[in-house]
Amino acid sequence: MNNNTLNITNQRTAAAMSQIYFLVVYQTAVMIVSLLGNLFLLFVIFRANQVMKRRVSPVQLLIIHTCVADLLFALLSLGTEILTLRTYPQYYGSNFVCKLMRYVQMFPMYASPFLLVAISADRYQAICRPLAHFRSSRYRRPNWMAAIAWGLALVLSIPQFFVWTKHSKTGRCSTIYGQNKNTVKITYVIMFNTLAWLLPSILAAVFYYCVCKAVRLSSTKSVRAMDSQKRNGKYSSGATEDYIEELRKKSKGFRQQMSEFDRKRVQTVRLTITIVACNFFLWMPFCLINVIQALWPEISHIMFINYVAILGNLNSCLNPWIYILFNRSHVRKALCRSRRSFTEVTKKRSFENFECSSTATMNNNYNNCHAYTAFSNRSQLKFDSYATDSTSLKTNSN
């Protein structure tokens, strides 16, 4: 009987160690990919702006803050968790180190969604309230939003000092309420999932709903204004309107100037919506299972929660690659060998465009000149014939 019990215990220990080994390998891979991706994104942003001789835009500034939050998540959250799993089931740090470790693990998990809300609020301010956006400083508002996000993350992570402790009997760094159902556990779990996942997702969704609504209304108003102008007869004649429209279609610079701003604005909105959606759906299984485990602890197992948390950890890996996918031109510019090569390519393209436009202009002038010469010849013929007729009239009269 004792041998059977010992065998069952050994089997459970071996199964637990294999699961821990899998978690260590997986989290190490996620940490490495997240570090490489976010560092590469920082290089792309700074290098592309350096090549194009531009300052970092407000949206890029907030994305840089998000990259820093993801880097801290990879180093502080995943890195310390890997070290803890390596020494499982013992924890060799002190009680204060246990509390501090759990605090720094939670800090990036609050900072990342708060920064996504800051990006959403910045886009709402720029598109839905453009006058207030241009009156305020271009970089002061994003800096204040980022500072508020970091400050809230620091404050809301403080309960970790009271929830976690190192137990003297087991020697583990675990929560004070354990695995059983507890009022403190339910309150803390619901508070974390509401503040770090649900509330930021709702705020970002509200901001982007207002942004999409404003874009749709502005396009509808522009169409209605054009229709009303046509009805009131404010446009020129049909021939003149067709001529102007044809010139606009032929003008490459006009098309680029009119579409560049709208394209960048829509692209930025799509980028941030994609990042917010990924954050919501990747953390949703972990947050829901965490709440279920707090309310009904007998249903789920702790290792099952660890496996579900795998999806949430992927968020720090996907964010930089989403930005790179939406800004492939920046990546190409950042990967140029030098600024000189990029400048030479730009000058070459500009020279080719200038040459083509100059050729077209010369052809245009030549055609106009040819038309004017033909018109002058016809006028000269008419004048000569008129002069001949006048001479003959004078001769007849004499």
From Swiss-Prot:
Localization (cell): Cell membrane
The entry's keywords: Behavior, Cell membrane, Disulfide bond, G-protein coupled receptor, Glycoprotein, Membrane, Receptor, Transducer, Transmembrane, Transmembrane helix
Gene3D superfamilies: Rhodopsin 7-helix transmembrane proteins (1.20.1070.10)
Native organism: Caenorhabditis elegans
Observed effect of gene inactivation: Viable and fertile. Males have reduced reproductive success, due to a range of aberrant mating behaviors. Double knockouts with ntr-1 partially rescue the reproductive phenotypes.
TM segment ranges: 26-46, 59-79, 100-120, 144-164, 188-208, 272-292, 303-325
Name of the encoding gene: ntr-2
Gene Ontology cellular-component terms listed: membrane; plasma membrane
Membrane topology: Multi-pass membrane protein
PROSITE patterns, A to Z: G_PROTEIN_RECEP_F1_2
Family as reported in the entry's similarity comment: Belongs to the G-protein coupled receptor 1 family. Vasopressin/oxytocin receptor subfamily.
Segments in the Cytoplasmic topological domain: 47-58, 121-143, 209-271, 326-398
GO molecular function: G protein-coupled receptor activity
Protein name in the entry: Nematocin receptor 2
